Amino acid sequence: MKRIGVLTSGGDSPGMNAAIRAVVRKAIYHDIEVYGIYHGYAGLISGHIEKLELGSVGDIIHRGGTKLYTARCPEFKDPAVREKGIEQLKKHGIEGLVVIGGDGSYQGAKKLTEQGFPCVGVPGTIDNDIPGTDFTIGFDTALNTVIDAIDKIRDTATSHERTYVIEVMGRHAGDIALWAGLADGAETILIPEAEYDMDDVIARLKRGSERGKKHSIIVVAEGVGSAIDIGKKIEEATNFDTRVTVLGHVQRGGSPSAQDRVLASRLGARAVELLMEGKGGRCVGIQNNKLVDHDIIEALAQKHVIDIDMYQLSKELSI
């Protein structure tokens, strides 16, 4: 393989630039040319493709976002549209493609693979919801952003003796809420993977108040439902002074953590190795701190599973 492409797709995550850098430098080290595809699958279809050199990826390892930009491209679900993308790849002499992104990006890579073009998926999403890897690129940075925000909110919650409901990202996965809530000692953590009883949440808050607790933190993954509605129910049932904070897109930005930079570098380089070995249709990951790769079709057939033991621990420690 003499020429490969790389793109980022879907929601951005801190560390994507480190992954791009690793792909480019690993490939060039092995005398393989690299072409960057801008704006994800949309750029692939339109032919927004440029050759990347060593200097193209200088001074980006510490930067959030993605140098290649990103976009969502629902029309890529159409086989005829994907064929246009494959034609663009062949036009530029590209023989393999590294796709950095989340579940939707993997779906695109899977479809390209099924249409005969070799792709390798690299997990880049703050949600940490990609099967086949313990951690995704961007999760650690987003987690630390959330923890920093909750630390600050707890300061004001303590000062004003308030209850705060804090909504974090995670439409289908509660990893950010669970890890941040546990790390910050949240009184309650609500995630999409676990049912909850609002009466139980209220009862726990009241028990805390009865033993002298003056403030509380509830961390809610967005997939659970409206944090505003939850806050209203709490205030109506308890008369506690309650505030709601939705952290939003601040979770996606910022300089990637050391862990995300290293993870992205390892995964990006491994993706290139797989293409060099002629192994398309794979996705890379890390499990027990060891690099792994899986069939991308089989990986997508699996479901991300929350750490139930950790969730139970959070409940036991927040009595």
From Swiss-Prot:
The active site is at residue 127. It is an enzyme of class 2 (transferase). CDD domains: Bacterial_PFK (cd00763). Pathway: Carbohydrate degradation; glycolysis; D-glyceraldehyde 3-phosphate and glycerone phosphate from D-glucose: step 3/4. It is found in: Cytoplasm. InterPro entries: ATP_PFK, ATP_PFK_prok-type, PFKA_ATP_prok, Phosphofructokinase_CS, Phosphofructokinase_dom, PKF_sf. Keywords: Allosteric enzyme, ATP-binding, Cytoplasm, Glycolysis, Kinase, Magnesium, Metal-binding, Nucleotide-binding, Transferase. ADP binds at residues 21-25, 154, 185-187, 211, 213-215. Its cofactor is Mg(2+). Mg(2+) binds at residue 103. One of its GO terms (molecular function) is metal ion binding. GO terms for biological process: canonical glycolysis; fructose 1,6-bisphosphate metabolic process; fructose 6-phosphate metabolic process. Its main location: cytoplasm. Catalyzes the phosphorylation of D-fructose 6-phosphate to fructose 1,6-bisphosphate by ATP, the first committing step of glycolysis. Homotetramer. This is ATP-dependent 6-phosphofructokinase. The lineage of its organism: Bacteria, Bacillati, Bacillota, Bacilli, Bacillales. The gene is pfkA.
